[in-house]
Amino acid sequence: MLTLALPKGRLAEESIDLMISKGWLSSKPDPNSKELIYNDPKGKIRILLVRSQDVATYVEQCAADAGISGWDVLKEGGYDLATPLDLKIGKCRLSLAAPNGFTLEAHHRKIRVATKYPNLAREFFFLKGLSCEIFKLYGSIELAPLVGLSDCIVDLVSTGGTLKANGLKELDIILESSARLVFNRSSLYGKRKEAVEFMDSLSKI
């Protein structure tokens, strides 16, 4: 049996649908249940439902054999994990956005940036040769430039609707993201047969 850490929310739902379609799960966990561990009747998969930011930690520390996490979270955290498979679900992009009239070229002082991704944001501005001050926030990132906390934001974008509704425009794409299957190296080799079967099955999308 493989123990799989999944992020709560839409990505978990998409991942579970994918595993059901591939025969790894027989049914969905009860959406009304408060239980965070789901043992599927087929006995192939045990699911741990955790916060999206915690998936990689559970896998890296061998509390789970594998996990499904956004590429944005994995790149931000710099985890020591095997990332053998892009599942091509949960697609979005990490982008720089700002109010109309803001441009990097016209900004001559330290740029104030609000984001949930301080490492990726800092790297982006460093590679541009620009100085920045990072404000790490945990939600409602679009609010920051509207109330003067920041000049711009670095945040995930799917359709761009939330940016537009708040008077922001997308200036640059920093990272294309999608859900990745990750393994800790111990489980990848210790449960190699199950791991390879799981990867091969999910890769045939």
Curated annotation (Swiss-Prot):
GO terms of biological process kind: L-histidine biosynthetic process
UniProt cross-references to SUPFAM superfamilies, sorted A to Z: Periplasmic binding protein-like II (SSF53850)
Reactions listed under catalytic activity: 1-(5-phospho-beta-D-ribosyl)-ATP + diphosphate = 5-phospho-alpha-D-ribose 1-diphosphate + ATP
Record's keyword terms, sorted: Amino-acid biosynthesis, ATP-binding, Cytoplasm, Glycosyltransferase, Histidine biosynthesis, Nucleotide-binding, Transferase
One GO CC term, this protein: cytoplasm
Ranges annotated as spanning the membrane: none
Enzyme class: transferase
Signal sequence segment: none
EC number: 2.4.2.17
Swiss-Prot/TrEMBL domain comment: Lacks the C-terminal regulatory region which is replaced by HisZ.
Function: Catalyzes the condensation of ATP and 5-phosphoribose 1-diphosphate to form N'-(5'-phosphoribosyl)-ATP (PR-ATP). Has a crucial role in the pathway because the rate of histidine biosynthesis seems to be controlled primarily by regulation of HisG enzymatic activity.
Subunit field text: Heteromultimer composed of HisG and HisZ subunits.
Family recorded in the similarity comment: Belongs to the ATP phosphoribosyltransferase family. Short subfamily.
UniProt name for this protein: ATP phosphoribosyltransferase
Provenance organism: Leptospira interrogans serogroup Icterohaemorrhagiae serovar Lai (strain 56601)
Gene name in the database record: hisG
